């Protein structure tokens, strides 16, 4: 059995949905289909999820958003008309959407989640209707009826363990299962969404619950590339990588696959195949527990911007019990999460995403560190990019760090910080945002130029 997930770009038009139909029906093993909301039909288009967010926010502010709501309905209507479906499905989507928008707004976060989730929910209903119209037995399955229960954390739901046993019962159903991605239900019966792009997570949860043999994730690229294609022309494709490698790359800016989505599949030992809806015959990228490390130490290079660092210096810091814990506790008390903590004997650097810390919070954090920890020096540096060099084979290859540092030096990129995880799956380099592209290109040239990568 295979669980198949299609992203928004694969479902943005009737023509795309017809491709999905042929992909699903070409393989009898594909029994469960997880769908996103319609994405962009063309470059200047707006994703349905973004329309719904704007619609919900305007309803919360003014109690009305007729133009935005009709724009959402129109996206579904265009798809339905392309597929020659009747108007009844569109009228149902319109009625359900307006009922939802005019519903209870006493909890704005939960209201926003319910409206956002309707993008996937209505698309699943439309897709199930299309499959039936084409003569295929297909059933829309509501996550609540299937028993997909999650924590009550709007916008950041975590699956509850009992869900997997509930979902296993879906194996008993005949025909195709069409399942909306991105959300589950709290035990109180409220719609709660995963983090953005959370349909990947739903697919992985469903694959785990159904004990699938394979989780296929269809998107709009032929494979996972070894580097961002906007930085390097015609980068190498990766045919196989491990869960840990994919997690590191997804975290650091690879947008092909949601980093949280690997966890349910990983725990069940289910391989993940990333494929292209527009070129389904391409082999794609397979994510597995273990792979042969025969093609060099590095499998991919990823980068992301929008970071800042808090540098803390104090003489004899290493002799002070609990210093690091107390520093991180100050961040916790300000509602801040951190990414990395490289350290020395008399200093430590806390790296975090700068978007979560405004000027007032920054001043408060600095003051607390100076007063509570009696730090000799506290310096905050903004506009940093983190570059991750990833590969399971790095632990078995001497000199990988030296090669990376030398490549950056020769490209005249100043390394602001460097950190290597204890697992040795990745190395992190911090550079100025303005030097991100140059740094990534230099590292790609060092590790991939002229080398066959798989």
UniProtKB/Swiss-Prot annotation:
Catalyzes the phosphorylation of the beta-carboxyl group of aspartic acid with ATP to yield 4-phospho-L-aspartate, which is involved in the branched biosynthetic pathway leading to the biosynthesis of amino acids threonine, isoleucine and methionine. GO terms for cellular component: cytosol. One of its GO terms (molecular function) is aspartate kinase activity. Pathway: Amino-acid biosynthesis; L-lysine biosynthesis via DAP pathway; (S)-tetrahydrodipicolinate from L-aspartate: step 1/4; Amino-acid biosynthesis; L-methionine biosynthesis via de novo pathway; L-homoserine from L-aspartate: step 1/3; Amino-acid biosynthesis; L-threonine biosynthesis; L-threonine from L-aspartate: step 1/5. Belongs to the aspartokinase family. The keyword Transport does not apply. PANTHER family: ASPARTATE KINASE, ASPARTOKINASE 3. Monomer. It is an enzyme of class 2 (transferase). This is Aspartokinase 3. It catalyses: L-aspartate + ATP = 4-phospho-L-aspartate + ADP. The keyword Signal does not apply. Pfam families: AA_kinase, ACT_9. GO terms for biological process: diaminopimelate biosynthetic process; homoserine biosynthetic process; lysine biosynthetic process via diaminopimelate; threonine biosynthetic process. Its EC number is 2.7.2.4. It comes from Bacillus subtilis (strain 168). Residues 312-388, 389-454 form the ACT domain. It comes from the Bacteria. The lineage of its organism: Bacteria, Bacillati, Bacillota, Bacilli, Bacillales. Gene3D superfamilies: Acetylglutamate kinase-like, Aspartokinase, catalytic domain, VC0802-like. NCBIfam families: asp_kinases (TIGR00657), PRK09034.1 (NF006540). Keywords: Amino-acid biosynthesis, ATP-binding, Diaminopimelate biosynthesis, Kinase, Lysine biosynthesis, Nucleotide-binding, Repeat, Transferase.
């Amino acid at each position: 059995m295979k669980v198949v997930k299609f992203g928004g770009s694969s479902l943005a038009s009737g023509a795309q949905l017809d491709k999905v139909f042929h992909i699903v029906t070409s393989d009898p093993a594909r029994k469960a289909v997880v769908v996103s909301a319609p994405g962009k039909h063309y470059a200047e288009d707006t994703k349905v999820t973004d329309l719904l967010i704007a619609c919900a926010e305007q309803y919360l502010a003014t109690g009305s958003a007729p133009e935005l709501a009709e724009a959402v309905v129109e996206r579904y209507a265009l798809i339905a008309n392309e597929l020659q479906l009747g108007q009844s499905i569109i009228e149902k989507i319109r009625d359900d959407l307006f009922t939802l928008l005019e519903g209870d707004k006493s909890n704005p976060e939960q209201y926003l989640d319910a409206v956002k989730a309707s993008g996937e929910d209505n698309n699943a209903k439309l897709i199930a209707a299309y499959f039936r119209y084409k003569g295929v037995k297909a059933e829309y399955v509501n996550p609540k009826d299937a028993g997909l229960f999650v924590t009550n954390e709007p916008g950041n739901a975590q699956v509850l363990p009992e869900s997997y046993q509930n979902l296993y019962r879906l194996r008993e159903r005949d025909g195709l299962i069409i399942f909306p991605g991105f959300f589950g239900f709290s035990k109180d019966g409220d719609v709660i969404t995963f983090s953005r792009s959370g349909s990947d997570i739903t697919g992985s949860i469903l694959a785990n619950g159904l004990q699938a043999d394979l989780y296929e994730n269809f998107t709009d690229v032929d494979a996972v590339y070894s580097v961002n294609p906007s930085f390097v022309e015609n980068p190498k494709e990766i045919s196989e990588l491990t869960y840990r490698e994919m997690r590191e790359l997804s975290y650091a800016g690879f947008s092909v696959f949601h980093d949280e989505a690997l966890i349910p599949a990983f725990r069940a030992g289910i391989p993940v195949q990333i494929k292209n809806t527009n070129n389904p015959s391409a082999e794609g990228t397979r994510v597995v527990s273990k792979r042969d490390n025969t093609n060099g130490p590095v499998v991919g290079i990823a980068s992301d911007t929008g970071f800042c660092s808090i540098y803390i210096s104090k003489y004899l810091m290493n002799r002070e019990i609990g210093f690091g814990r107390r520093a991180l506790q100050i961040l916790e008390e300000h509602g801040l999460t951190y990414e990395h903590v490289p350290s020395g004997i008399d200093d430590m650097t806390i790296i975090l995403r700068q978007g979560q810390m405004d000027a007032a919070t920054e001043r408060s954090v600095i003051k607390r560190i100076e007063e509570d920890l009696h730090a000799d020096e506290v310096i905050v540096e903004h506009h940093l990019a983190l570059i991750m060099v990833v590969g399971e084979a790095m632990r078995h290859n001497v000199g990988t760090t030296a090669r990376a540092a030398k490549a950056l030096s020769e490209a005249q990129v100043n390394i602001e910080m460097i950190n290597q995880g204890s697992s040795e799956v990745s190395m992190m380099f911090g550079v100025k945002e303005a030097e991100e592209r140059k740094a990534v290109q230099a590292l790609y040239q060092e590790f991939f130029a002229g080398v066959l990568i798989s």
